[in-house]
């Protein structure tokens, strides 16, 4: 066996987690690597749509439930750790299936996007985080535009972590060209499987997903985190769904209907940026999930994967 990489891509909520699990179960030896910064946090489960225990008990999943609420996992640290794990899996004859939720981390991992190699400075970072707490996201964006407008454009709405990191690097005195590196992951082939569906159907699915999260206890999950930490500015709460619930609990969002709408719009904005980014990647093999049953989808993807592995 060579060093194959099977990647599952697509906008949030399109069905990547389910396909990855069913694909892993159909292969002789496979592990799933979750590239989703939300799922890194132990306390954030409902709003991040983590794989259920039924999945994680049957197939080894990496990078799920690895951080406490206050911890930050930089793209550089993730790329280093994930690259090491991939080498170990290949040495053991295990096929890695990468589920690309956070596209910046994914493309940094596979060497198609540069990232910061500047070590974090806790003093500077805390100062920037305090600005985020006091003035909010738009203030951070305005500050970043002054020093690095191109980087600001590439940071998705709600990604306070990357905004904070970008400003930290700027305040440390580094120019963008001095602060970046590109990973050199040693794989033989990277088969990229993309999932998509028609716009209207996808929007309906996304709204249903948000409503399910609320009914499943997202508000209570956030309340539990706040009761234990007393801090609504924690990294684990600075993500879509969680920050809106924090606003709801503060009375800034009037009712649950408005809460659902706000979370949906945040997810939709995020998804549109994901779709735009993915359309630029001409190496993705696309599958329309609306045209196939789950079983048919798995069969077609499995055929492609097995053919790829045989030639690796």
Swiss-Prot record:
Keyword tRNA processing: yes
Database matches in InterPro entries: Dimethylallyltransferase, IPT, P-loop_NTPase
Chain residues that bind ATP: 10-17
Site feature location: Interaction with substrate tRNA: 102, 125
Gene Ontology BP, a term: tRNA modification
HAMAP family cross-referenced by the UniProt entry: IPP_trans
Function: Catalyzes the transfer of a dimethylallyl group onto the adenine at position 37 in tRNAs that read codons beginning with uridine, leading to the formation of N6-(dimethylallyl)adenosine (i(6)A).
Protein's name in the database: tRNA dimethylallyltransferase
Organism: Coprothermobacter proteolyticus (strain ATCC 35245 / DSM 5265 / OCM 4 / BT)
Taxonomic classification: Bacteria, Pseudomonadati, Coprothermobacterota, Coprothermobacteria, Coprothermobacterales
Gene giving rise to this polypeptide: miaA
